[in-house]
Amino acid sequence: KEVYRHLLERGERMYSESIGEKRMRIAALLEELEAALQQEQPQHIREVFRRVKSALDEWEADAVSFFS
């Protein structure tokens, strides 16, 4: 689905802009989402999608508040 592709692209962008532990955590989340998509189990995909989206949202919010 397109929503999953957009989340992967967003995560890849954040990965390329990050360093250290945050970068490693983003990589692990993206790998988990890609694995879920390959398994093609809708319930599992939705759970992983929510977890990845929540983490990326939180990190972006932290970055925005840091620069505000």
Located regions from the model:
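PAZ/PAZ-like end-binding module
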Residues: 1-68
